[in-house]
Amino acid sequence: MDKLQAIRGIAFDLDGTLVDSAPGLTSAVDNALYALELPVAGEERVITWIGNGADVLMERALTWARQERATLRAAMGKPSVDDHDIPQDEQLRILRKLFDRYYAEAAEEGSFLFPAVADTLGALHAKGLPLALITNKPTPFVAPLLDALDIAKYFTVVIGGDDVQNKKPHPEPLLLVAEKLSLAPAELLFVGDSRNDIQAAKAAGCCSVGLTYGYNYGEPLALSEPDYLFDQFNELLPALGLPHSETQELKHD
């Protein structure tokens, strides 16, 4: 693993990498849709929409819900569009506001660390490697979630979706982290679970680790060709020359 020998810092994606946030996100999405009298989506579908930030999540949810409702109305012999519908752009604006309200209530209770995350972060931190977090999640939700999961203490730099002009898969947030840590891009390892993460790493010139257990729009992450592909989070430790315990966090915190 020659590329890993040059690593002097590590940055992580959040949703689908460190945290199983699907329950909380699904609750917020479905409550927002229900409030607008639209069909609810369910977790299996919402998982395929995660990864590009809240605006895109809401666009995907609304597009699906309107199509689903049109199909249901057609099956009942009704016009696909209700004359009383508000314009779609206004509906999207309201949906996003509703989502923010519901997610503020559901984020912490509906989010869980994936197996081995806390112990692995602790081991990397103890080695002296600077750790960073890069997420497309709206910035106001990030710090409270990290605090609730007791992992905020591990990160030197945290970049949320509102902290940059261009979110992943653009390289801007990764290059910003490298700058803040005084590292060359090739010295920063980026760990994520989606093609957005791998594309961002490639564009920034960073080494990448892809994790197979996360949210990747229903497609195999191997198709994105990360530098390394792991099935478990704690595989990072032996890859970086650190001890790996088989008993580390075999269940959610």
Curated annotation (Swiss-Prot):
CDD domains, sorted: HAD_PGPase
Pfam family, one: Hydrolase
Residue numbers annotated as active site: D13
GO BP annotations, alphabetical order: carbohydrate metabolic process; DNA repair; glycolate biosynthetic process
Protein's pathway: Organic acid metabolism; glycolate biosynthesis; glycolate from 2-phosphoglycolate: step 1/1
GO cellular component, one term: cytosol
Cofactor needs: Mg(2+); chloride
Residues noted as binding Mg(2+) in the record, renumbered to the chain: D13, D15, D193
Catalytic activity: 2-phosphoglycolate + H2O = glycolate + phosphate
Alphabetized UniProt keyword annotations: Carbohydrate metabolism, Chloride, Hydrolase, Magnesium, Metal-binding
Gene Ontology molecular-function annotations: metal ion binding; phosphoglycolate phosphatase activity
Matches recorded under InterPro entries: HAD-like_hydrolase_sf, HAD-like_sf, HAD-SF_hydro_IA, HAD_sf, PGP-like_dom2, PGPase_prok
Family: Belongs to the HAD-like hydrolase superfamily. CbbY/CbbZ/Gph/YieH family.
Quaternary state and interactors: Monomer.
Functional note: Specifically catalyzes the dephosphorylation of 2-phosphoglycolate. Is involved in the dissimilation of the intracellular 2-phosphoglycolate formed during the DNA repair of 3'-phosphoglycolate ends, a major class of DNA lesions induced by oxidative stress.
Protein name as it appears in the record: Phosphoglycolate phosphatase
Naturally occurring in which organism (per UniProt): Klebsiella aerogenes
Gene it is expressed from: gph
